[in-house]
Amino acid sequence: MSRIALGLAYDGSAWQGWQTQPHGVTVQDQVEAALASFAGGGGPVATVCAGRTDTGVHAAMQVIHLDTDLQRRDESWVRGVNAFLPPSIVVQWARPVSEAFHARFSARSRTYVYLLWRGRVRPALWAGRAGWAFQPLDVPAMRAAARALLGEHDFSSFRSSQCQARHPVRTLHRLDIDERGAFLVFTLRANAFLHHMVRNLIGALLQVGQGREPVAWMDALLCARDRRLGAPTFMPDGLYLSAIEYPAEFGFDELDGGITLLSPFTGALG
């Protein structure tokens, strides 16, 4: 039995999140069915992912692992599994890893990117792939509010009521807000994220950007540790799991899908 790691990308618009469900309309169900078909239909295949994305959330870089007796070249895994996947899900790479590697528990950090369209009307060509806010936004105020969120905190004010995490303390290493033409690009990196945490952070930052709350509100909200005082959960459309960081011992040089996500649109984004 050997352990294989796969790097995935997917458009989450048509899927009800990553995690398997009885109805089978999830990314995990599609991936495991494709793996079983590639393996010859010898039985179910179980996978573990780095980060469980919600309904409508995308991934430019998702990492999974599985244990298998199947021996194939790395490129055979990529092309063979992709032959059984729908167009919106793709295996980008495959490689053998040691038994010590765990897609979820070995990860040091996860990075999410949120693409927000600031046009007067909703972005038809980005439907399902970018969030939208038509009101004018005070970006410097949003950046000032974001600084209060950096570091290790109890993020109870930004977790959903369905969150199953054992504790709400997370370390937010990075929260950048970049203006690129009609887009705002939010980049958030943390050791791990709570359920709906990124979308709740974006929603709160927009409250500040729209002038509905002062900059100091963000720190007060963080200290309150009460989700009921926060902003509504923002739409999932523009949210992408973009990078996973692992210790050097596992030999992953660069697992940043954000480069691929943004590079084709450099001109459009400014």
From Swiss-Prot:
Substrate binds at Y112. Gene3D superfamilies: Pseudouridine synthase I, catalytic domain, C-terminal subdomain (3.30.70.660), Pseudouridine synthase I, catalytic domain, N-terminal subdomain (3.30.70.580). Keywords: Isomerase, tRNA processing. It comes from the Bacteria. GO terms for molecular function: RNA binding; tRNA pseudouridine(38-40) synthase activity. It catalyses: uridine(38/39/40) in tRNA = pseudouridine(38/39/40) in tRNA. Homodimer. NCBIfam families: hisT_truA. Belongs to the tRNA pseudouridine synthase TruA family. Formation of pseudouridine at positions 38, 39 and 40 in the anticodon stem and loop of transfer RNAs. PANTHER family: PSEUDOURIDYLATE SYNTHASE (PTHR11142), TRNA PSEUDOURIDINE SYNTHASE-LIKE 1 (PTHR11142:SF0). This is tRNA pseudouridine synthase A. It comes from Bordetella pertussis (strain Tohama I / ATCC BAA-589 / NCTC 13251).
